[in-house]
């Protein structure tokens, strides 16, 4: 291959001084001829001897690399035009397991899309100047936290002409970033997978998207938008809700957070209790009027707490705890930055901090992961930390999170707590069951024998609708009872097995009060505020908070055989003031038994009831990951720089 350069014209600068119009026309004609003959490539030799290569196409003049037309779809991995051709925009290749795509290295876009940069400073134009920092490409940008992305856009460097073009685009981007900042999501990265978002985070993102629509006269319904928010972030969320209201909209919020309730104009309190004891409007009216009234005539428990007639009292004294502690050195993962953390044993320890400050990373990926590995007796190195000691004082670790108590509709509170095993034993011990030779398995809907085989003991039959969601219809053989007719003929105190499973926890506790093996388990469920659940309620219908409390209840009746480290993540989600009080009593009971409870929490009643606090921060995302305060609630309250 040979490069042949043909000289088209030579123009002296002096000609522009003598006859500028003629010189420009001559230059234009020369460029057009050169571009035509060279298929879009032209070289210009300057008076100082330097050469400059220009192209009329999307081709790099230096190495000849071609470039597609730059348009929005180039930066979308959902478009065949922009997706990496090797992995089709997935970022992984499925062989025996999902492996990172070797071409795009998991970035999901074609190489050309990654060569377009934005910068916060002026880039060198001369080709002789070395471009050590070209700025950020789209993958770099979406990998930023929302707060960092906003700072980048505020400092974006554009030429005068480009800035004029980009003004409306930059404004739309910054407005949307502001909306997410205003609802307390500054710590999230823009490329965060939707599947990894908590319910509260997903709800606040939907709320942020509504701020940009400018709707007027709309009704917004929100279900506990403050879930997972630190008290500091509540103010921004409340400000956002008030902004929507000022636009002329109506905001209906289901909420237990005190700050949000006090920001409301009108209060509707439903109760007085849960389940069969609820469903009644106990109090309603303008909030200021209800608070200013001389007496809480409605008897509303909510108003009683809001008027400070009832409150969660401070512990009389903080526990001294037991000898020994779990010491973790060099905890490093995500935004955790080489932190040393000490957890005293035999105490209620509360982990606090603003959203995204590293609390969950520490609890799940450092503390639980390594403790579980130690108790499993596996010889594996410490992960995400330099060292961890103190687990020798404990016998086991239990993570009580908000994951479902079962993966199928067959799981329910009775099966999870073990109460159903004793209930089946009770039915099989009846004279009628013994006369028929029936064992406990006859009263199980999980195995063949006594269950309805038409629906396999589900009570419903799934009808596949192909492109539509699956429809469930009541079984026409057992009419939803889940059992064969003969099985239901056996009763205990006038109730068959189906009728027992339809009882609420509260009803069943009274019904089985003379059977300790069953009553103890039901008492635990009742103590956690779950008296309204039915024994046979499907696990798939329980909220995350309810599932978590079922797990806590299952620990209360467990005999004390070894000291346990309990780890809880925001157990107060979805709880009323009164339920929070009950939860605190239960957690304190676990500690009184010699166990250690570590809980992530934003609820101030739980925080003030703790024996020891570990506060992460000071901010979320890259601005967090440090232990900024530790000690008793009184000691942490004196620490400057701690939002908690």
Model feature map: region roles:
Residues 1-644:
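Conserved phosphate-binding elements of NTP-dependent enzyme cores
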